[in-house]
UniProtKB/Swiss-Prot annotation:
Disulfide bonds: none annotated. Gene3D superfamilies: FAD/NAD(P)-binding domain, GidA associated domain, C-terminal subdomain, tRNA uridine 5-carboxymethylaminomethyl modification enzyme MnmG/GidA. Its cofactor is FAD. It is found in: Cytoplasm. It comes from Paraburkholderia phytofirmans (strain DSM 17436 / LMG 22146 / PsJN). NAD(+) binds at residues 274-288. This is tRNA uridine 5-carboxymethylaminomethyl modification enzyme MnmG.
Amino acid sequence: MLFPTEFDVIVVGGGHAGTEAALASARMGNTTLLLTHNIETLGQMSCNPSIGGIGKGHLVKEVDALGGAMAAATDEGGIQFRILNSSKGPAVRATRAQADRLLYKQAIRHRLENQPNLWLFQQAVDDLMVEGDRVVGAVTQVGIRFRARAVVLTAGTFLDGKIHVGLNNYTGGRAGDPAAVSLSARLKELKLPQGRLKTGTPPRIDGRTIDFSQLEEQPGDLDPVPVFSFLGRVEQHPRQVPCWVTHTNERTHDIIRGGLDRSPMYTGVIEGVGPRYCPSIEDKIHRFASKESHQIFLEPEGLTTNEFYPNGISTSLPFDVQLELVRSMRGLEHAHILRPGYAIEYDYFDPRGLKASLETKVINGLFFAGQINGTTGYEEAAAQGLLAGINAGLFVQGKEAWCPRRDQAYLGVLVDDLVTRGVSEPYRMFTSRAEYRLSLREDNADMRLTEIGRELGVVDDIRWDAFSRKRDAVSRETERLRTTWVNPKTLPADEATPLLGKPIDHEYSLADLLRRPGVSYDGVCGLRAGACAAPEALAEDDVLLAQIKEQIEIGIKYQGYIDRQAGEIERNEAHESTRLPEGVDYAEVRGLSFEARQKLTQFRPETIGQASRISGITPAAISLLMVHLKRGLGRRPTKPAEPGADNKPVTQ
């Protein structure tokens, strides 16, 4: 049957990508339908019970700056918060939180059920409705046909998913959920470039059988307790609890080696490539054979359960080997496993078949987000979902897509890496992937993106008001520090020396003093018995005040480096903003090598900047392209070749 209501946007899948996509589209005023195989699993944390980390926390802050739900839900469900790399520079500091699975899921569902313009419907999707080169809807497993002007597909690990425990395997999207076999087959018929990846999860342990007296306690940050959202408050956090640390040992490693003959990874049963930066314990003892021990973190799954997640022993070994290896570690000698660990193999689609908007190049109005694009991690999925939801909304409104640049957001780095370089293994975000990371910090994600989000329609009045107050306070106070001066007469040696280490010998602005190593904003404001402080409070609450102080201090201390990076960004702007028309015939570009012509024709980059990041495209090739552009590009008389004509990703 045809469902009586036609929607602007349909989102398929209710994981971290799907929920952010649906919320973003609906916030923009588009009638949006979220189709999920099970409403009870909306926002479910399928693997580790944590959000954030190095690079990942930056993405969460960016999602939050654009009005997304992940950071706010983490503040409501987070049971331990830490700032990683707190002793290092601001570019690599990152927030990480342990989350109560149930509280997090409840927070996400509450937002979905109370979002205007958003409808939920429980049915698995088996097919897409495609007319010509455009998607027009989706078909569920019982034949209900939903029509829409755009579709966002966020299928996670469900596409033809296969779960492995030892040499036993069965179809599934994750433990307890069916795989999307029909939908995967349908996508392959559409000639989208496809491949196979693998990920895994560890066994879960009953906390009542753990001897915590044998373990090292790892508490969260308590003074102050961090918050994730720019609008977050410590009072939103539930009760805070510690994690615990144990280690593998030689006996553990011997047990694992003894079970490799029954490992699906080492017997050729699993063909998909696993994540390099979240390897299974089998991979660890093989790749790091000389290492005698690996650190294992026991992470609580929630406040109302005894279940613990042993971070670091993801495995697909047979259950008897899993039980033996768990019990070989200190504190786990009598551990009871509640759920076995497993590996899951699933289809993904080569992201080089996508535009920078995450719309597929071969089917108009069809957007992909999350693990379907070859990424791994909740945060990477949420960021892609947000962008796909925004661009699906812009698509149905007849507006130009928003494609964040590499110098603008980690989201821009993530998408640019995917659509220009593709993936040969599950992609994970790190700060090292961003060449402009000093400008892309967690603390300034709102300064970079909230104004853009307001223009796009995804930032509400409450967030906009809070941001405006923060932005104005930072601007005013920074200017005051730069224009307020002290000299040896107004700042005597006995006042200057305790803060600065020596007296001042001539006139300085307060900003000059703050720029010195070891000098804090509060320290400068405390000079002259507090006479150097701002004449009025910068903010009414402590969290916003801390954010303002951090912005001011970083902006002044790192101004020289930030200005230098801004100059580099400006020099590269010409390449990033120079678009390549869709009909470019690269065979007509004089001097291009055969390899360059082949790759440019296959991947169809949208800008000169994207072209420069394709493997095998040299600076000389870019120069030839620029010359060709100035002459006036020849165009192909026919439609560009489908990037996935052979239905397989091309290895770079």
